[in-house]
């Protein structure tokens, strides 16, 4: 549960092989990439992405409360997330915390839309019939802003 609350994905079900960039899953913010050390596989690509700002999506931690939701719903319907009726991302993983009946998970959000998100905004989804909230861990703050 803490892994989802802190937005730390693992495994091939949460991280798409050959398509997910290290910066999308916040490895740069967690100290998983060195931009001082050279000569490692992918070093030039990672540096170019970081310094040119080419990341288009970011993983963020989400949560929502819905007693009627079951995880099997996610496989049967669209897992898209909306902000003001605009598709801005998708749910990657979910897990129920039985202590407080809250679903915690990770979503992939378009970075171009993330700057529009404010604390009082709630994201919408079709599969859970609930408002999704994002609680950014301290390592993700301040939020990226539109350039």
Where are these regions (language model features)?
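Anionic-ligand-binding alpha/beta catalytic cores of soluble enzymes and soluble regulatory domains
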Residues: 2-64
């Amino acid at each position: 549960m803490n892994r989802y609350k802190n937005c730390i994905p693992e495994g091939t079900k949460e991280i798409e092989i050959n398509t997910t960039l290290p910066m999308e899953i916040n490895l740069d913010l967690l100290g998983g990439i060195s931009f001082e050390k050279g000569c490692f596989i992918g070093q030039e690509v990672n540096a170019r992405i970081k310094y040119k700002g080419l990341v288009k999506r970011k993983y963020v931690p989400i949560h929502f409360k819905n007693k009627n939701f079951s995880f099997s719903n996610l496989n049967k319907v669209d897992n898209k997330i909306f902000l003001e009726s605009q598709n801005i991302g998708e749910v990657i993983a979910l897990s129920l915390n039985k202590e407080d009946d809250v679903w915690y998970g990770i979503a992939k959000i378009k970075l171009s839309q993330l700057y529009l998100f404010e604390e009082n905004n709630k994201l919408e989804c079709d599969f859970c019939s609930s408002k999704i909230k994002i609680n950014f861990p301290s390592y993700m703050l301040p939020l990226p802003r539109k350039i």
